């Protein structure tokens, strides 16, 4: 934990702690039985039935291993097995058990079996000397358990670590000396490199090293790392290239260029190099090599030249000590020859724990269970762009990829900016004075910035701004920044969130004048922007993406490789998609955390009756310009009054209509794209209500198959808006922002008339959160009563205040004093625009408006 907490690159002495993890025992058995065990059975087919009962994790191939693909050995003593990243010896111990049983079956004594395993069969290597010692101890203890007399034997397991001091002496022969000197030079970095070191020795030089192996630990290591093995079984270290120290990084780039993305992929290449032809390696590692573009060359090489015989696709929760979705694994067996038959795959992703996954594997009922996928041809994977290991892909989806053009052929798909230090260059828009904020021009400092965000479809997540003053001068100077694809900046686009663990991709329409981040990568359609957005939000696209890359990240390359088809119903699809964007945009701007926010929803509904809501069109419901019209009318005409409870009911009705319309639209779009791609037998168009991405500020939850309204949230949004009115952030008689900058003018602070009442803006942007009888005439409780009277009518004031308190389950005074600040911080993502000042014991509390604060604000609070 301490090593990972420091982040950055790992030093040589930190690599063991950063890369060691205990492999579940049943997965070790699976790997050993399907490598060492399978080689033995290929050579002794008459014993298959006897061992099949003992080896419950052995996977039967669709057909026996072809004769020309069998790795033959003469005697059991010839079978060489190794773990080149053995840790404390868990895998070595399982190899020992299996080999021991084979020896006993073939008539060897216990001592003979143990001696042959230690001297002839088994090798372990680890760069951590402590792990090596544990491994030696565990194997020796196991040997003594098998035969008590072995404690007196002078035979130890062959488990090696990196030489600390002793290197190889230089031979007298000059030519050999040059080779041995190169070996010694490489061994000096052994603490960083471990088993991935490559020693290029001529036969004569290797023979010379062999002659020194018994008395020289460096020689023993070199021999072990230049040996050809029949079987390798490993849980290799996981370490991305960004965490490698300079020595390790350079060596990997120089010697393992195609697999440099991670240390586990380096070990995949190493395993092939160290295997004999027809040998097998079993490995558990991260599933990322199966899908990510950074491992595409590795996949291509593997699929073209070697055979994935079987695989347990484990996914998340493989290691019980590692929770969450990020660490996702696969265990598999690869044979060193080209594939002559299909592979056997087990899809265990749904197991909630390692034990669940084991039971899924042991108890599968055969083909068609969505767990077992037998005899899958490797050639199928190369039909899919990027050749992901998509063993579960049906023929219908395979045809979709084969018969469609890639999306990138009609749309540019681009990564965006990496600022190098988001803490310096990014802000939420409401943190910035609107004097410095540019939403459409190029003369200010802060510009709209698209950076992924929460799972939200169609529109939204437009809440950040970036320092792009003087064409991004400061970002360009920052050493780790990257400015990509600047010619696409500020163009209309379809963006998506890079990382998602919820319901797949969420694509959104982006209006012009936005810059975009690498996490907000975007596609730039020439004409069919709404069609593209509809496709990306469809089930078809989501399933295709899960084939291209079922990890948590939707990379630019994955989007570019999607199969993309036009349709004769394109115009109809675009109309529905436009409506979805329209509804989602209206939802986004109806919250005050959007810079297009106009007016609180309850106030805007005063002019809508129940009958109006039943008959009014969707366009009128979402007409954002009507807010200012309503505000102006209420400022100029006779006072109007309304019951808050009635307005909340109207709110329910209005937003239920919009929510269900969006839901129906999404299902219709799924229906259309399922037909376009001919996937009627594969997919259904239904969309769960919890995947509809409006009303995401807790206004509703889904219970059963219906919306449950949280009226207290709706009313809290009203009180938050009221606070903004008092501070001058908003005006009741005008829509949108009013004061969001320091030093407002006298004119900006002048009182105004609304609904027949004079509305005053607080003179200093400070109001107390105190009891009604505290003596402060501008405290929040008194202001709330006045606000409710001014906006909703004096005749309903008491009824409306009682309704608020009844809904909250507490008094308004208690809400302001105990809950408002917490709710405000949550709404503004811990970037509050109203700052809380409180005495040590909380006897006195007040709120100050960020944009109106001055150096004298704390003193003014004390003096008041």
Language-model regions: role of each:
Residues 1-70, 406-439, 447-449, 454-466, ...:
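Class I S-adenosyl-L-methionine
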Residues 6-11, 15-311, 337-338, 343-344, ...:
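SAM-dependent methyltransferase catalytic region
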Residues 43-59, 110-114, 148-156, 586-599, ...:
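Short, glycine/acidic-rich hinge or "gate" loops at secondary-structure transitions
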Residues 54-80, 205-233, 253, 315-317, ...:
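Flexible, glycine/threonine-enriched loop-and-boundary segments that flank and lead into catalytic domains
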Residues 82-85, 125, 271-275, 520-530, ...:
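Proline-centric
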Residues 93, 100, 127, 132, ...:
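Signature of N6-adenine DNA methyltransferases within the class I
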Residues 592-593, 601, 607, 612, ...:
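Terminal accessory regions of large proteins
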Residues 621, 629-630, 637-639:
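Short, low-complexity intrinsically disordered segments enriched in A/P/G/S/L with frequent Arg
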């Amino acid at each position: 934990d301490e090593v990972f907490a420091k982040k950055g690159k790992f030093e040589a002495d930190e690599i063991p702690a950063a890369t060691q993890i205990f492999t579940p025992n049943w997965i070790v058995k699976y790997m050993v039985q399907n490598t060492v065990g399978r080689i033995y059975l290929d050579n002794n087919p008459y014993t298959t039935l006897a061992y099949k009962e003992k080896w419950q994790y052995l996977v039967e191939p669709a057909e026996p291993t072809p004769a020309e693909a069998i790795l033959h050995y003469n005697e059991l003593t010839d079978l060489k097995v190794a773990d080149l990243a053995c840790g404390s010896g868990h895998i070595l111990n399982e190899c020992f058990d299996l080999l021991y049983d084979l020896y006993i079956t073939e008539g060897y004594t216990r001592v003979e079996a143990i001696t042959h395993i230690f001297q002839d069969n088994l090798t372990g290597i680890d760069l951590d000397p402590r792990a090596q010692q544990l491994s030696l101890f565990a194997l020796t203890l196991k040997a003594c358990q098998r035969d008590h007399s072995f404690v007196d034997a002078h035979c130890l397991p062959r488990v090696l670590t990196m030489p600390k001091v002793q290197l190889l002496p230089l031979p007298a022969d000059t030519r050999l000396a040059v080779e041995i000197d190169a070996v010694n030079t490489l061994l000096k970095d052994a603490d960083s490199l471990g088993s991935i070191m490559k020693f290029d020795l001529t036969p004569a030089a290797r023979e010379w090293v062999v002659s020194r192996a018994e008395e020289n630990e460096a020689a023993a290591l070199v021999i072990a790392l230049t040996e050809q093995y029949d079987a390798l079984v490993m849980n290799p270290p996981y370490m991305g290239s960004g965490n490698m120290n300079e020595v390790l990084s350079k060596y990997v780039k120089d010697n393992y260029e195609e697999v440099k993305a991670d240390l586990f992929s380096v070990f995949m290449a190493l395993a092939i190099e160290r295997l004999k032809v027809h040998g097998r390696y079993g490995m558990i590692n991260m599933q990322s090599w199966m899908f990510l573009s950074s491992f595409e060359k590795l996949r291509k090489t593997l699929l073209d030249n070697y055979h994935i015989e079987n695989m347990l696709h484990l996914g998340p929760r493989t290691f019980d000590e590692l929770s969450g979705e990020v660490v996702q694994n696969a265990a598999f067996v690869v044979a060193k020859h080209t594939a002559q038959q299909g592979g056997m795959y087990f899809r265990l992703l749904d197991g909630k724990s390692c034990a669940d996954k084991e039971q899924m594997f042991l108890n599968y009922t055969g083909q068609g269970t969505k767990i077992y996928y037998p005899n899958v041809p490797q050639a199928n994977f190369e039909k899919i762009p990027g050749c992901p290991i998509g063993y579960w892909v049906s023929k219908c989806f395979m045809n979709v990829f084969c018969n469609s053009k890639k999306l990138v052929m009609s749309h540019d798909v681009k990564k965006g900016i990496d600022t190098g230090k988001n803490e310096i260059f990014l802000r939420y828009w409401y943190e910035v004075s609107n004097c410095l904020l540019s939403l459409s021009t190029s003369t200010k400092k802060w510009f709209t910035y698209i950076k992924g965000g929460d799972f939200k479809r169609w529109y939204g997540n437009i809440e950040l701004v970036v320092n792009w003053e003087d064409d991004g001068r400061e970002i360009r100077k920052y050493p780790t920044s990257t400015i990509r694809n600047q010619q696409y900046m500020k163009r209309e686009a379809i963006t998506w969130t890079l990382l998602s663990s919820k319901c797949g991709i969420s694509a959104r329409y982006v209006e012009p004048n936005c810059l975009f981040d690498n996490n907000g990568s975007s596609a730039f359609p020439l004409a069919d922007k709404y069609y593209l957005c509809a496709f990306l939000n469809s089930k078809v696209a989501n399933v295709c993406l899960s084939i291209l890359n079922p990890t948590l990240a939707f990379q630019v390359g994955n989007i570019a490789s999607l199969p993309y088809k036009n349709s004769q119903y394109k115009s109809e699809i675009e109309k529905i998609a436009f409506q979805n964007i329209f509804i989602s945009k209206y939802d986004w701007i109806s919250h005050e955390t959007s810079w297009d926010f106009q007016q609180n929803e309850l106030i805007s509904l005063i002019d809508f009756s129940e009958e109006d809501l039943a008959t009014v069109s969707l366009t009128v419901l979402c007409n954002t310009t009507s807010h200012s019209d309503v505000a102006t009318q209420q400022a100029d005409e006779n006072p109007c009054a309304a019951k808050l409870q009635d307005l909340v009911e109207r709110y329910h009705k209005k937003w239920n209509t919009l929510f269900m319309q969006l839901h129906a639209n999404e299902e219709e779009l799924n229906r259309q794209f399922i037909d376009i791609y001919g996937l009627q037998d594969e997919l259904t168009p239904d969309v769960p209500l919890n995947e509809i991405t409006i009303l995401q500020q807790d206004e509703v939850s889904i219970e059963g198959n219906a919306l449950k309204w949280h009226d207290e949230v709706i009313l809290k949004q009203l009180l938050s808006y009221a606070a903004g009115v008092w501070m001058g952030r908003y005006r009741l008689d005008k829509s949108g922002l009013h004061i969001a900058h320091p030093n407002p003018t006298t004119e900006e602070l002048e009182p105004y008339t609304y609904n027949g009442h004079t509305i005053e803006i607080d003179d200093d942007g400070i109001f107390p959160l105190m009891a009604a009888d505290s003596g402060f005439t501008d405290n929040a409780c008194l202001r709330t009563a006045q606000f409710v009277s001014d906006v909703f009518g004096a005749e309903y004031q008491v009824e409306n205040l009682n309704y608020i308190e009844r809904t909250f389950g507490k008094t308004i005074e208690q809400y302001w004093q105990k809950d408002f600040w917490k709710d405000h911080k949550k709404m503004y993502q811990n970037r509050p625009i109203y700052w809380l000042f409180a005495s040590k014991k909380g006897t006195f509390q007040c709120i100050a408006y960020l944009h109106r604060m001055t150096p004298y604000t704390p003193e003014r609070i004390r003096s008041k």
